[in-house]
Swiss-Prot record:
It comes from the Bacteria. Keywords: Ribonucleoprotein, Ribosomal protein, RNA-binding, rRNA-binding, tRNA-binding. It holds the Pfam family Ribosomal_S13. This is Small ribosomal subunit protein uS13. GO terms for molecular function: rRNA binding; structural constituent of ribosome; tRNA binding. It comes from Nitratidesulfovibrio vulgaris (strain DSM 19637 / Miyazaki F). The gene is rpsM. The lineage of its organism: Bacteria, Pseudomonadati, Thermodesulfobacteriota, Desulfovibrionia, Desulfovibrionales. Belongs to the universal ribosomal protein uS13 family.
Length: 122
């Protein structure tokens, strides 16, 4: 089992699919990495030699932010928005949609479960 960027890649999967198990790597980026390293995308992860795995690992470390570094950067960007008090930061702080979606109806995922209306006592 190959271990790249702290993630155990699944055995028996194609290399391009297995790379998508790494946070921050999608199909397009996986194919770009394989093109740069010269590894055939249709091969199984089990069939890769140690040199090929090391080359993929080296390419990821040099040219891509993945896993913890990427998560840290995203959270620091959101924290920066909240600290400077811009509109997007306020929306993050209040737990509302950030990109201009309507909130009168919908936005339940972002807002959480509905609060029940207070009923009239009999």
């Amino acid at each position: 089992m190959a271990r790249i960027a702290g993630v155990d890649l699944p055995r028996g999967k194609r290399v391009d699919i297995a790379l998508t198990y790494i946070y921050g790597i999608g199909r397009t980026t996986a194919l770009q990495i394989l093109d740069v390293t010269g590894v055939d995308w249709s091969r199984n992860i089990d069939d890769l030699s140690a040199d090929e795995v090391n080359e993929i690992r080296k390419e990821l470390e040099q040219n891509h932010k993945v896993e913890g570094d990427l998560r840290r950067e995203i959270s620091s960007n959101i924290k920066r928005l909240m600290d400077i008090g811009c509109y997007r930061g306020l929306r993050h702080r209040r737990g509302l949609p950030v990109h201009g979606q309507r909130t009168h109806t919908n936005a339940r995922t972002r807002k959480g479960p509905r609060r029940g209306a207070v009923g009239k006592k009999k």
